[in-house]
Curated annotation (Swiss-Prot):
This is K(+)/H(+) antiporter NhaP2. The keyword Disulfide bond does not apply. It comes from Shewanella sp. (strain W3-18-1). GO terms for biological process: cell volume homeostasis. Residues 405-486 form the RCK C-terminal domain. SUPFAM superfamilies: FAD-binding/transporter-associated domain-like, TrkA C-terminal domain-like. It is a multi-pass membrane protein. The gene is nhaP2.
Length: 574
C-alpha cells in the first residue's frame, strides 16, 4: 500500500466516521437504534450504495469486529454493578445456556424448512443467530430506568451467552466440514465446560491480577486506561488461545475492575466510553460495507418468515422455558425479556466462521444472519421504549446530577464531585445553606451563580439557576439528587408507585381501618415488610408489585436489599 492509498484510506474512514456521528441524532428523532444508523452508513458507502466501495475482506471484518466487541464488553462489565447479580445471575445463566440452545433448535428447524437445507445446516443458521448481542443490548438499555431484575438479566445474559453460541457454531461447522466426524456427547460436554470454565477462571483470575497491577502502578493518569485496555485484550486473547471464551473472560475482567476500588477508575471509564463509541461505529461501518444489499432480495420473503419466527415464537418459548424455575419474574417481565432478544454484531461475526472455513452455502448463512440482525434492530430495537411501557417494567426516571467526576486522592477513594443545577421548583431555592439537611459525609464545595464563584457559608441563600458542586460518595447519590435535582413530573411517580407511600415497619393492623383491610389473626401480627416478603420472596427490587385485598402494592424504596417504602394504589372505584 503506497502513501496515496494510505491517505485515501484515512480520508474515507474519517469521513464515514464523521458522517455516522453527525447522523446519530436522527436515531432519537426516528425512534430507531443508533447502531442501525452506523450500519446504514456502511451499507450506503458499500458496493450497492452511493459510495460504491467494494469490500469483501472477511478476515479484516472478523478482526475489527472481535476487537470492537472485546472493548464494548470490557466497558459494559465495568459499568455493571455486582449487586445486580443477586437478583439476576441464575436467570441470566439459564437464558445464556438453555435459552440459546432452545432458540438455536427452533430457529434451525425453521431455517431448514424455509430454505430447503439439511437439518444440520439449519441448526448452524440457528446457532449463528441464537445469541443476543452485548453491543446492541448495552447500547439500547444504557440510560433507561428499568426494573433492576429485568435490566440486569438482559445485560448479564448478553454478556455471557456468546460461549454457548460459539460452541454450537464451531461444533456444527466441524461436523459439516467433515461428514465422517463423530463427536461424542462426552466430547461436546467437555468442550462446552472448557468454554465456560476457562472463560470464567481466566476472566476472574486475570481481572484480579490486572486490578492489583493497576493499583500498584504509579503512572500518568491517561495511561491507566491504556493498561486496563491492553490487559483486558491480553486476557481475551489468552482465553481464546486456550479454548475458553474470550468474550466471557473480558466481560468478567471489566466486572471485577468496575466493582473494586481501582486507581483512576473514573478516568478509565471516561476513556472507555469514547473507545466504545469508536468501536461501535467502526464495527458496524465495516459490517455494513461487507453487505451487498442486492443479495438479500433473493431471501426476502423466507428471510422475513425466519426473523419473525425467531422473534415471535423461538425466543419467547426459550425465555418462558428457561425462566420456569424463577417465580420472581411476572408474565410482563417474561414478555419484555422475550422482546429484547436483540441481535447485532455477534451473529454477523459468527456468520463469518463458515466463510473462513469454506463451507458450501456459507454466503447464504452470512446473508441470513445479516437479514435477521436488520429486522431485529428495526423491529425490536425501535419498539423498545413502547415495549417497556406496555410491559410496565420502566420505572419513573431518577433525578441525577448534570455531571459527576471522581476525586481520586488514593487508589481506593470513593469520593466524587456531583454537580447540580437548581430549578425553580426546588424547595431549597431562597433558603440559606444552614437549613439544608445534607446527607452524612457530604459537603457543598462550591456554588456558581452565573459566571461568578461564591464562597458558600451557612448564610448563603440559594437561587434558581445556581450550580452546586457537592463532595460525596455514591451511597449518598439518591439523597443528594432528590435534594437538588430536577424531579420527574409530579404525576409520573403516583401513576407508577401508587396514591400513598408507607414505611414497611408499619403493622397491617394499623392500616386496616384506613384501607378497609380484612385481616385474620395471623395477618394482624404482620408488618408491611412481612407481607412483601411473603408475596415477593427474598430479593424484591424497586417496581415489583402485587395485588392483595383489592389494593395494588408497589415496592418504592430499597436500602441494602431491604424494602423500606411501598406505594399503595387504591382500586379504581375508590
Amino acid at each position: 500500500m503506497d502513501a496515496d492509498s494510505i491517505n485515501s484510506f484515512f480520508l474515507i474512514g474519517a469521513l464515514l466516521a464523521a458522517v455516522s456521528v453527525l447522523l446519530s441524532p436522527m436515531s432519537s428523532r426516528l425512534g430507531i437504534p443508533i447502531l442501525l444508523i452506523f450500519l446504514a452508513v456502511g451499507i450506503l458507502a458499500g458496493e450497492d450504495g452511493l459510495g460504491g466501495i467494494q469490500f469483501d475482506d472477511y478476515s479484516t471484518a472478523y478482526l475489527v469486529s472481535n476487537l470492537a466487541l472485546a472493548i464494548i464488553l470490557l466497558d459494559g462489565g465495568m459499568r455493571t454493578r455486582v449487586a445486580s447479580f443477586r437478583v439476576a445471575l441464575w436467570p441470566a445463566l439459564s437464558l445464556a445456556t438453555f435459552g440459546v440452545a432452545i432458540t438455536t433448535s427452533i430457529t434451525g428447524l425453521m431455517a431448514a424448512w424455509l430454505f430447503d437445507l439439511h437439518w444440520l445446516q439449519g441448526l448452524l443458521v440457528g446457532a449463528i443467530v441464537g445469541s443476543t448481542d452485548a453491543a446492541a443490548v448495552f447500547s439500547l438499555l444504557k440510560g433507561r430506568s428499568l426494573n433492576e431484575r429485568v435490566g440486569a438479566t438482559l445485560e448479564i445474559e448478553s454478556g455471557s451467552n456468546d460461549p454457548m453460541a460459539v460452541f454450537l457454531t464451531v461444533t456444527l461447522i466441524a461436523i459439516l466440514a467433515n461428514v465422517d466426524t463423530e463427536l461424542s456427547v462426552s466430547f461436546m460436554l467437555v468442550s462446552f465446560i472448557k468454554q465456560f470454565g476457562l472463560g470464567i477462571c481466566l476472566g476472574l483470575g486475570g481481572g484480579w491480577l490486572l486490578w492489583k497491577l493497576v493499583n500498584l502502578s504509579k503512572l500518568a493518569e491517561g495511561l491507566y486506561s491504556i493498561l486496563v485496555l491492553s490487559g483486558g485484550l491480553i486476557i481475551y486473547a489468552v482465553s481464546n488461545k486456550l479454548g475458553g471464551s474470550g468474550i466471557l473472560s473480558i466481560y468478567l475482567v471489566g466486572l471485577f475492575l468496575g466493582n473494586k476500588p481501582t486507581r483512576g477508575r473514573h478516568s478509565i471509564l471516561n476513556v472507555l466510553d469514547g473507545m466504545t463509541w469508536v468501536s461501535q461505529i467502526g464495527m458496524f461501518l465495516v459490517l455494513g460495507l461487507l453487505l451487498t444489499p442486492s443479495d438479500l432480495f433473493d431471501i426476502l420473503l423466507p428471510g422475513f418468515a425466519l426473523a419473525f419466527g425467531m422473534i415471535l415464537f423461538a425466543r419467547p418459548l426459550a425465555v418462558w422455558l428457561s425462566l420456569l424455575p424463577f417465580k420472581s419474574f411476572s408474565s410482563r417481565d417474561r414478555w419484555f425479556i422475550s422482546w429484547v432478544g436483540l441481535r447485532g454484531a455477534v451473529p454477523i461475526i459468527l456468520a463469518v466462521f463458515p466463510m473462513m472455513a469454506g463451507l458450501p452455502g456459507a454466503q447464504l448463512y452470512f446473508n441470513l444472519a445479516f437479514f435477521v440482525v436488520l429486522v431485529s434492530l428495526l423491529i425490536q430495537g425501535a419498539s423498545l421504549t413502547t415495549a417497556a411501557r406496555l410491559a410496565k417494567v420502566e420505572l419513573p426516571p431518577k433525578p441525577l446530577p448534570i455531571s459527576r467526576s471522581g476525586v481520586e486522592i488514593y487508589p481506593s477513594s470513593e469520593w466524587e464531585v456531583f454537580v447540580y443545577c437548581l430549578s425553580e421548583n426546588k424547595w431549597c431555592v431562597g433558603e440559606p445553606l444552614k437549613r439544608l439537611s445534607m446527607p452524612d459525609g457530604t459537603r457543598i464545595a462550591a456554588v456558581f451563580r452565573g459566571d461568578k464563584l461564591l464562597h458558600p457559608s451557612g448564610s448563603t441563600c440559594l437561587e434558581a439557576g445556581d450550580i452546586l458542586c457537592v463532595l460525596g460518595q455514591e451511597r449518598s447519590l439518591d439523597a443528594l439528587s432528590h435534594l437538588f435535582s430536577q424531579a420527574p413530573e409530579t404525576k409520573e411517580v403516583p401513576r407508577f408507585f401508587g396514591d400513598f407511600f408507607i414505611e414497611t415497619d408499619v403493622k397491617l393492623a394499623d392500616l386496616a381501618p384506613i384501607y378497609g383491610l380484612d385481616l385474620d389473626e395471623e395477618a394482624s401480627e404482620m408488618t408491611v415488610a412481612d407481607l412483601v416478603a411473603s408475596e415477593l420472596g427474598a430479593h424484591p427490587v424497586i417496581g415489583d408489585h402485587f395485588q392483595w385485598q383489592s389494593l395494588h402494592w408497589v415496592v418504592a424504596g430499597l436500602h441494602e436489599g431491604k424494602v423500606t417504602n411501598i406505594g399503595i394504589r387504591l382500586p379504581p372505584e375508590t
